[in-house]
Amino acid sequence: MNEKCTVRRAFVASGQVQGVGFRPFVYRLAHEGGLTGTVGNTSEGVRMEVQGAEAEVRRFGQRLQAELPPLARLTGLKEEELPPVAQEDAFAIVQSSGHAGHSVLVSPDVGVCADCLADMADPQNPRYNYPFTNCTNCGPRYTITRSIPYDRAVTSMSCFPLCPRCAAEYANPADRRFHAQHVACPVCGPTLWFVGKEDAAAGRTCPQWVSVQDKEALTRLALERSGQVLLDGG
């Protein structure tokens, strides 16, 4: 086959491929190879359709298996030849689709990564001291997922619409939070509150919010006075 002729090939990846930065990874591979097409989550895993020169499509398939994101695990990869699509000029992440009778592995929750820890430690960073800082390489998955395919709309994060800054990160292919479904910040994401003994005794279930620094100070004070600190993940 002429390696410069245009071909179109579908790949269906199964395994731990949702909630692990797999679609952004595919998006970058396609752009680096000058390929057009689509990628989207399904209830079987992730479906990709790529179109371009035969050599680049073949290289895409090789890199797909050799350069997986850190949290991704492939258990299967199906390929299918498709007829080329005329006048297609871009590669896009498309809306997820699901079908009854299929299942996909859901990624476990992942401890905070070094990059996010650096964000939390930087006083100039918008996520300074924010306890729910995460990206495509870390953060909650399994415990916030209600159904598959994995998208923000079917997770606990659906209650927290993205602020303009987080939305810009989510839409930026060069950002490590590109298409991170659980992305959040102090402006738009979950927060914590401190309930003292007096609040509980008085039946106050919605005390005033306090900052991370205030919570740390109150927690230290409670421990210094031989108090108890309860963390509720509900």
Summary of predicted features, one role per range:
Residues M1-W193, A200-A202, W209-S211, R220-L221:
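Intrinsically disordered, low-complexity, mixed-charge
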Residues V229-G234:
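Glycine-rich N-terminal segment of FAD-binding domains in flavoprotein oxidoreductases
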Residues R204-T205, S226:
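Short intrinsically disordered, low-complexity segments
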Residues D214-Q228:
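Flexible, low-complexity linker/loop segments at domain and module junctions
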